[in-house]
Amino acid sequence: MVKIRLTRGGAKKRPFYQIIVTDSRNKRDGRNIERVGHYNPVAQGAESRVVLNVARVEHWVRNGAQLTDKVRSLLKEVSKTQATAS
């Protein structure tokens, strides 16, 4: 099964996550099919907290990919900010 989930990067006490499309059997930080965005939970100042390619996420969901709970909430957050910006 294909999943859209987070993979951790960054440094100790300073996490940074890539939002990736991967097979569910792969390790958390293992191989991925495509990178569709990133999430910085400790963003400060002008740094962006979430960057997500919504069109690619929708493409993968249409083709059967499952979202993890955190990615689903991030997608909702991005959609909300795009709606208010328009």
UniProtKB/Swiss-Prot annotation:
Gene3D superfamilies to which the protein is assigned, alphabetical: 3.30.1320.10
Keywords, sorted A to Z: Ribonucleoprotein, Ribosomal protein
Any Pfam family: Ribosomal_S16
One of the record's GO cellular component terms: cytoplasm
GO biological process, one term: translation
Entry protein name: Small ribosomal subunit protein bS16
PANTHER family linked: 30S RIBOSOMAL PROTEIN S16, SMALL RIBOSOMAL SUBUNIT PROTEIN BS16M
Family per record: Belongs to the bacterial ribosomal protein bS16 family.
Superkingdom of source: Bacteria
UniProt xrefs under InterPro entries: Ribosomal_bS16 (IPR000307), Ribosomal_bS16_CS (IPR020592), Ribosomal_bS16_dom_sf (IPR023803)
